A protein has these predicted regions:
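A short helix-loop-beta-strand connector motif used in the catalytic cores of GNAT acetyltransferases and
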Residues: 47-59
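Juxtamembrane/interface motifs at transmembrane-helix termini
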Residues: 37-41, 49-51, 89
Length: 148
């Protein structure tokens, strides 16, 4: 079988798998909000995400199976903050690097990421993609990548 990756925008029908990933123990440890999320809260979040013109959530599919998400939040005209989640069963398989590479390949501007300093897999991945550390504050590393 040929390996096929597809990065697409999230739809309302993706809510269940996204909630499973969001409430995963390791995802919550690495998130800035580590609270469990209810079905009602999550469905409302997805609905608001889809209608927010300054926020877009993408899902990466591998052979049509959802394996990760990347969210962009527009801060300025050419500046986006990125955050991402990998399916628990696909962690450690370079999915994050593939997903970020597919996302960044045809984009221009400044891209920011905030990563907890203890999240070494994420730090290693974004540094490999060329993100540079520009600030540290309260155990959070701030990274930036400029693409022109």
């Amino acid at each position: 079988m040929r390996k096929s990756f597809n990065l697409r925008e999230v739809t309302k029908s993706d809510w269940k798998v996204l909630l499973e990933w969001r409430n995963d123990k390791i995802t919550r440890q690495n998130s800035f909000n580590s609270d469990l999320v209810s079905v009602r809260e999550h469905k409302e979040y997805i609905k608001n995400m889809i209608t927010n013109p300054n926020r877009t959530l993408f899902i990466l599919e591998y052979n049509e199976i959802p394996v990760g998400t990347i969210r962009e939040d527009r801060l300025e005209k050419d500046e986006l903050e990125l955050s991402y989640t990998i399916s628990p069963i696909y962690r450690g398989k370079k999915i994050g690097q593939i997903m970020m590479s597919l996302y960044l390949i045809e984009r221009k501007g400044s891209f920011l990421c905030e990563v907890k300093e203890e999240n070494s897999p994420s730090i290693k991945m974004i540094e490999k993609l060329g993100f540079k550390l520009f600030n540290k504050e309260k155990r959070v590393n701030f990274y930036k990548l400029n693409l022109s």
